[in-house]
Amino acid sequence: IQKAKSRGAKIKYIFQTHFHADFVSGHLTLSKMTDAPIIYGPNAKPDYKCIIAADGEFFEIGKIKIKVLHTPGHTLESCSYLLYNENNEPHAIFTGDTLFLGDVGIPDVAQRYKDTTKEELASILYDSINTKIKPLVDNLIVYPGHGAGSACGRNMMKETVDTLKNQKVNNYALNGKFNKEDFVKELTENLPEPPAYFPLNVRLNQTGYMDFDTVLENSMKKINSDEFKELIKNPQIVILDTRSSKDFIKSHIKDSIFIGLEGRFA
């Protein structure tokens, strides 16, 4: 919001590629603060007001426009957004968790589809990539939803932006290395169980959540040392240490859990 104001711009739409599992996206709070509608692609069934776009639908933003590409596979509602410049030429694509740099999004088992197996999701993803993304122009700029370190993929490149031309060479999903059968096997073999909080995040992103400001207001309250000592007598209390790993190693409170927030988020 601050960046938009500094540039004299208005946030017109909030585009969601899918129901995220690894974080709460903040889309509802942003929509409330800006009056911008939330956009999802086909198959999304949120419990709040939004626009469910059709595959191929365009949204105009000033002199540019964005085309919705339904690219299921990571999830059934996953989509990518193709940006056209002022000359009506494809300029960039925002691929969410469908296509990463050097990798693709693994089937999102956190959503636990009743009628769709991980193998079927991988097969659908193969079709999405080969029919919707691979045919696009080589000079297209690719902006994926994650960089290296995310649990939504396995072998992502450390870079966060690339051209589709480079990905057609360096990404196994685009360079013809695998046929569909081998692709499905590669993507689903030894697939790890998702972190325990993933299904909760999916539900929050789909059904709604408490505003972040309210969460902070309720949670970020100072306590003195005596109050702290009393609180930790309760076995249900969990202590999270968010300092650097260096500081945690030097000393930490007994039984505290290290989750250092050092500015690097995948």
Residue ranges and their predicted role:
Residues 1-70, 84, 89-91:
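Active-site HxH/HxHxD metal-binding segment of metal-dependent hydrolases
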Residues 9-14, 110-118, 207-216, 253-254:
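Short, basic, glycine/proline-bearing loop/turn elements
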Residues 47-51, 103-104, 266:
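Short, charged, surface-exposed secondary-structure boundary motifs
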Residues 65, 75-193:
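Metallo-beta-lactamase
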Residues 67, 93, 238-240:
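Conserved beta-strand elements of the Class I
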Residues 122, 135-137, 151-161, 165-266:
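Cytosolic catalytic domains that perform sulfur/thiol-centered chemistry
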